[in-house]
Swiss-Prot record:
GO terms for biological process: DNA repair; methylation. It comes from Canis lupus familiaris. Its EC number is 2.1.1.63. Its cofactor is Zn(2+). Binds 1 zinc ion. The modification Phosphoserine is found at residue 14. Zn(2+) binds at residues 5, 24, 29, 89. Belongs to the MGMT family. Residues 192-216 are annotated as: Disordered. The active site is at 149 (nucleophile). This is Methylated-DNA--protein-cysteine methyltransferase. The gene is MGMT. SUPFAM superfamilies: Methylated DNA-protein cysteine methyltransferase domain (SSF53155), Methylated DNA-protein cysteine methyltransferase, C-terminal domain (SSF46767). Pfam families: DNA_binding_1, Methyltransf_1N. It catalyses: a 6-O-methyl-2'-deoxyguanosine in DNA + L-cysteinyl-[protein] = S-methyl-L-cysteinyl-[protein] + a 2'-deoxyguanosine in DNA; a 4-O-methyl-thymidine in DNA + L-cysteinyl-[protein] = a thymidine in DNA + S-methyl-L-cysteinyl-[protein].
Length: 216
């Protein structure tokens, strides 16, 4: 984080519990799930409009855009392709690391309704043998849901791991119309369209398992 960053925080309700968004005027720093509740696995009514905690005058443009994006994600996903993605200003994206490349490719290419395997994402980031390093990149993701690490699954179709818990990953994929099954990337996206830009180490040599799933 730059010394010049003046941090702002916003909390909103969601079907997954309270979500805290932090960032500065230049972009988002983190999205965190707090007081996580067990998602209802069955069909649910659309959530109520987000309850925002904090003073509106403290909202920077990236925070405003992030709240609008998350609200649309949970309530009306069909409008997502027309929404701008908030800028991201986390230090991880200010380095030319493999992790940064992986997260950028995931954000740019794997859309709502698609899934991608660890091995596919490693190849998209320029190193097809670095599936295990992709797992590490997912654990380092500072802005989950926005950068959709929940869409990264095993090539066998197994769910794989998720920092937010498997119940949350399963709920997010079901919300996007994806149940158990092999990765759909490339193509097959539930929502088409171009998303407008959020993002203005050495990979591990260890392979993934035979089913294409990273072992953490």
């Amino acid at each position: 984080m730059d010394k010049a960053c003046k941090m702002r925080y916003k909390t909103m309700d969601s079907p997954l519990g309270k979500i805290e968004i932090s960032g500065c005027a230049q972009g988002l720093h983190e999205i965190r799930l707090h007081d996580r509740k067990t998602p209802d696995p069955g069909p649910a009514e659309a959530p109520a409009p987000p309850e925002l905690l904090g003073c509106p005058e403290e909202m920077t443009e990236p925070l405003v855009q992030c709240v609008a994006w998350l609200d649309a994600y949970f309530r009306e996903p069909s409008v997502l392709p027309g929404l701008p993605l908030p800028a991201i200003h986390h230090p991880i994206f200010q380095r030319g690391s493999f992790t940064a490349r992986v997260l950028r490719k995931l954000l740019e290419l794997v859309k709502f309704g698609d899934t991608v395997s660890y091995q596919q994402l490693a190849a998209l980031a320029g190193n097809p043998k670095a599936a295990r390093a992709v797992g590490g990149a997912m654990r380092s993701n500072p802005v989950p849901i926005l950068i959709p690490c929940h869409r990264v699954v095993c090539s066998s179709g197994a769910m794989g791991n998720y920092t937010g818990g498997l119940a949350t990953k399963e709920w997010l994929l079901a919300h996007e119309g994806r149940l158990a099954g092999k990765p759909t990337y490339p193509g097959g996206s539930y929502l088409a369209g171009t998303r407008r830009g959020a993002l203005g180490g050495t990979p591990s040599p260890h392979p993934a398992g035979r089913d294409g799933c990273v072992r953490e």
